[in-house]
Amino acid sequence: MAVPKRKTSKSNTKMRRAANSKMEATGFVSCPQCHEPKLPHRVCPDCGYYKGKEVVSK
């Protein structure tokens, strides 16, 4: 019966397990002010609004 010659390190074990559980890319949402696509939980790059308030003036 085959037996490992050396103990597998914690780093190698975690890297091997992480290869099977890759994160999915976040989707876009439409801005409620200008209806342009933007990343969620971020200021809209087109109009500068976040949560209904103008954060960045254009």
From Swiss-Prot:
Species lineage: Bacteria, Bacillati, Bacillota, Clostridia, Peptostreptococcales
Record keywords: Ribonucleoprotein, Ribosomal protein
Start-end of Basic residues biased regions: 1-19
Protein name, UniProt field: Large ribosomal subunit protein bL32
Classification via SUPFAM superfamilies: Zn-binding ribosomal proteins
Region (Disordered): 1-22
GO terms (BP aspect): translation
Similarity section: Belongs to the bacterial ribosomal protein bL32 family.
Pfam family for this entry, one: Ribosomal_L32p
Protein encoded by which gene: rpmF
GO-annotated molecular function: structural constituent of ribosome
Cellular component, GO, one term: large ribosomal subunit
